[in-house]
Amino acid sequence: MANFLFLFRRSPNPEKASPEEMQVIMQKWMSWVEDLKKKGVYKAGEPLMPTGKTLHKDNVVTDGPFAEGKELVGGFFIVDAPDIDAAIDMAKACPDLPRGGTVEVRDIAKM
């Protein structure tokens, strides 16, 4: 088994959801996480705040990301899977996919 990173991305201007729709979306996320935990493949994950800072060469710090970008990283999971195809199959259940979100699946290198 190997560890894989799921990076959840979405439009900086997502469709506005009503409070009732947000509750349904959050329940889908919680159900997905619980399913991954029951299968013993969920290792970690958290949503990310919409803004942050970037450290560059010579210790220059810039604000960002900005809404001009195509997509914002909204969160991450670390999961355990036998290979990237199995990890992709897990990612297909992401509740944001039907709303236009994306999931980038990356193999985490062992060091």
Model-derived features with residue positions:
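Conserved, structured core segments of small domains
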Residues: 1-111
